[in-house]
Amino acid sequence: MSEKKIKITQVRSIIGGTRKQKATIQALGLGRPNYSVEKKDNACTKGQIRVVQHLVKVEEV
């Protein structure tokens, strides 16, 4: 059975962000605006997205 995936795209720069936000962006595999990654849709990923919700765009794949 196939797991749900979400596409996370960084839309804003992390400049001026807190250490926690910078670490979360790095943990998600992002780094620059317009970078995108596909991750499993689980509680861990949703928690990370919540920390940087103002910097990313999320869509289901």
Curated annotation (Swiss-Prot):
Pfam families listed in its UniProt record: Ribosomal_L30
Segments passing through the bilayer: none
Keyword set includes Ribosomal protein: yes
GO cellular component annotations of the record: cytosolic large ribosomal subunit
GO terms of molecular function: structural constituent of ribosome
Keywords: Ribonucleoprotein, Ribosomal protein
Family: Belongs to the universal ribosomal protein uL30 family.
Name the record gives this protein: Large ribosomal subunit protein uL30
Lineage: Bacteria, Pseudomonadati, Chlorobiota, Chlorobiia, Chlorobiales
